[in-house]
Amino acid sequence: MADNAHLRGTGVVQQENNGFGPLSKRRGNTATVTSAIVFVISGALLLLAVRKEKATSEGIHFLVFTAALLTLSFVLGELVRRFCLVSEELKHRHARYQGNWKGVLKTTFTFDNAGSILVVAISSALTLCFVLYEQYEAFSGPGYPILFFLNCLVVPQLSFLVGLRQLSPVETSDLNEKENKNVADGLAWSYYFGYLKLVLPRLGDRIAESDTYRHKITVEKLFILLPKTCYTFDAITKADPRVKWAGKLPASKINRAGILERSYQHAVHRIEMPLPDGTVEEYHFVLEYATPLMSLYEMSDHAKAPLTGPERDHQVVLFIRKLKEILDDSEECRGKYELVPISGNDTNKIADVLVGMHGAASIDLEDETDEQTKQ
């Protein structure tokens, strides 16, 4: 059976997610693989070049010694650079770390791949010792210590001062996505824990309790509108007059955040689609906007919460992707929702999108019923 939670649509309205545009996927390991390929090719070319200039044994010793020297100096240079960071953190020791020296050092000298870095540093040091033991006279000249200290003390500080250590926008974006540090990640988690996790498991019961809509709502899911513009109308009928407000489901009353029997209530919307024979077919949906998107819209329009148009477009894509990941992993919510990305600019298209998704969901429901019957 097809995954009911997938973003879907049919026909003309399914042009790049209903006009929303492409939804990006998480970044993979292509950059790491490319770096490894460059490393291998460069190493091989250097080895060939050294072998042509010098005797094979001497050339290999030179290449190994220089690589170990530069690697060790680079690691030590990074430690020296981070020591400079400590000088700033000491000014905030009481406010940020409650006066804890261990906290200052931990946040400054923590490495994600500390084990690998330690192995590389020790291996480089042992390699230097071995090569010096084997050919001390060849590698004991004054040029090598100067090169070591330049690469250890001068170059790291210079690169830090001129900004070469600054992460690129791509790296910053990748880091934020991996560690859930984007604005969109926080909004998606808040939307889930503060609302969807509470109402989606109860949605079927609320529909069943409604004498008016229990037989009219044939797809028992919450349809969540996700406009790329992030602007949410106070009434969906303003975005598409064919989507009419029909009524409400019985409320779910939940004790939440000090409020006893807090009320959560879904709106039901009706769409009337004319058929070729002149009759009209009615569809009923439990439908609403994703309310956190309005926060993104207002942030992009507020001077003290600067969020440019391109940044907002990026965040809304991340919001949809993160929300889908969260809901797909939740047994309580899986199969009880449909994400409906739309452009937000084109009016009078929401009804077409919803009817197309209704048809796809109905087919999935029939397939599921047939499978259960066969079993």
Swiss-Prot record:
Positions with a binding annotation for 2',3'-cGAMP: 195, 256, 262
Organism for this UniProt entry: Stylophora pistillata (Smooth cauliflower coral)
GO molecular-function terms, A-Z: 2',3'-cyclic GMP-AMP binding; cyclic-di-GMP binding
Topology class, membrane: Multi-pass membrane protein
One cellular-component annotation, GO: autophagosome
Gene name tied to this protein: STING2
Transmembrane segments: 30-50, 60-80, 114-134, 144-164
Family annotation (InterPro entries): STING, STING_C_sf, STING_LBD, STING_TM
Keyword list, A-Z: Immunity, Innate immunity, Membrane, Transmembrane, Transmembrane helix
UniProt name for this protein: Stimulator of interferon genes protein 2
Acyltransferase keyword on record: no
Record-stated family: Belongs to the STING family.
PANTHER family in the cross-refs: STIMULATOR OF INTERFERON GENES PROTEIN
Cited function: Facilitator of innate immune signaling that acts as a sensor of second messenger signals produced by cyclic GMP-AMP synthase-like receptors (cGLRs) and promotes the production of type I interferon. Innate immune response is triggered in response to nucleotides from viruses and bacteria delivered to the cytoplasm. Acts by binding cyclic dinucleotides: recognizes and binds 2'-3' linked cGAMP (2'-3'-cGAMP), a second messengers produced by cGLRs in response to nucleotides in the cytosol, such as double-stranded RNA (dsRNA).
Gene Ontology terms describing biological process: activation of innate immune response; autophagosome assembly; innate immune response; positive regulation of macroautophagy; positive regulation of type I interferon production; reticulophagy
Keyword Transcription regulation on entry: no
Annotated compartments: Membrane
